[in-house]
Amino acid sequence: MARIVGVELPNNKKTFVALTYIYGIGPARAKEILKNTNIDGDKRVKDLTDEEISRISKYITDHYKVEGELRQEVERNIKRLIEIGCYRGIRHKIGLPVRGQKTHSNARTRKGPRASRIKKK
């Protein structure tokens, strides 16, 4: 298994698919990385040479925030929203949808399981 920016990439996957296992890299960015490093995206990870792996790794670290660094930035942004007390920060704080979705009958994922009520006889 190839290790790029601290993530083990599965050997049997094509390179452009395997790169999406890295937090912060989606399909479009994976193809862009492979294009700029002159590596065939249809090549399997197990067939990559050490030189190609190091080229990909260097390109990613030089051009993008990924994994822990990106997670920390997102977390800091959310903390800042909470601290300044804006609408989005308040919604994050109380665990409700942030982007204007309706919550009367939906948003179960964000709100958590239903609180059951005890029925009176």
From Swiss-Prot:
Ranges where the record places region Disordered: 97-121
Q: What does this protein do?
A: Located at the top of the head of the 30S subunit, it contacts several helices of the 16S rRNA. In the 70S ribosome it contacts the 23S rRNA (bridge B1a) and protein L5 of the 50S subunit (bridge B1b), connecting the 2 subunits; these bridges are implicated in subunit movement. Contacts the tRNAs in the A and P-sites.
Organism of origin is Kosmotoga olearia (strain ATCC BAA-1733 / DSM 21960 / TBF 19.5.1)
Report the family membership.
Answer: Belongs to the universal ribosomal protein uS13 family.
> Is Ribosomal protein included in the keywords of this UniProt record?
yes
Q: What is this protein called?
A: Small ribosomal subunit protein uS13
A Pfam short name: Ribosomal_S13
Q: Which UniProt keywords apply?
A: Ribonucleoprotein, Ribosomal protein, RNA-binding, rRNA-binding, tRNA-binding
State any GO BP term from the record. translation
Record-level GO cellular component terms = cytosol; small ribosomal subunit
Q: How does it assemble?
A: Part of the 30S ribosomal subunit. Forms a loose heterodimer with protein S19. Forms two bridges to the 50S subunit in the 70S ribosome.
